[in-house]
Amino acid sequence: VKPKKTRFTLEPMQWMVPASPQEYVKILQDVDREGFAVHMDAINFIKDPYTYTHKRELLDETFELLGSQTRSCHLKDCILESGTTVAIKEVPLGEGTMEIPYYLEKIAALDEDTPVLLEHLPDMEAYDRAIDWLKKQSLWR
């Protein structure tokens, strides 16, 4: 198969490969095909207190390693729940602590046709609220 416009990507997850930007680079090198690219979901690289509290560093490293091969992105938010066990929870856009403006700045440097997708919201009203939040933050272009 030699796709001309389509790319096969994997969504990173905290609990499966690729679970880090470095693992994604390794997979890209191992597969070594032009048709294999990156789906960016930086929130899914947040898996422990360190990556949670160093999000800008994580974004810098992630886009440095994977930006040139990124073909699509997820946009979402997260919080670290209080308690003795680490629990990073996905929350609606604007209700968490993700560096959304910085993340969008990084995404804006990608190809202008790169799609940015919201996901895991419970209903259309939640998607509308997320878009409204982006507009109020002057982050919608």
Describe these PLM feature segments.
Residues 18-141:
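Histidine-acidic metal/acid-base catalytic patches
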